[in-house]
Amino acid sequence: MKEEWTGELIGKMHNKDITLDDLAEELGVGKSYVSMILNGKRNPSGARERLYSAFEKIAERKEKI
């Protein structure tokens, strides 16, 4: 089941032009794995915190460019 936070994160990714590839690279996992989490097909413990942390790091780097 897809959780509400995943939709929020996808919206934020869209607004900041951050891709699944960006998140996957930051986390050191495959793009398909990130997609499964965001689509509710996987729910590993700590996923929300890890994905939001990676998102914030990427967003900060993009703002400095």
Predicted regions: what is each one?
Residues 22-24:
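Short alpha-helical "recognition helix" segments of helix-turn-helix
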Residues 29-43:
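Recognition helix of helix-turn-helix/homeodomain-like DNA-binding domains
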Residues 1-15:
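A short, Lys/Arg-rich alpha-helix, primarily the initiator
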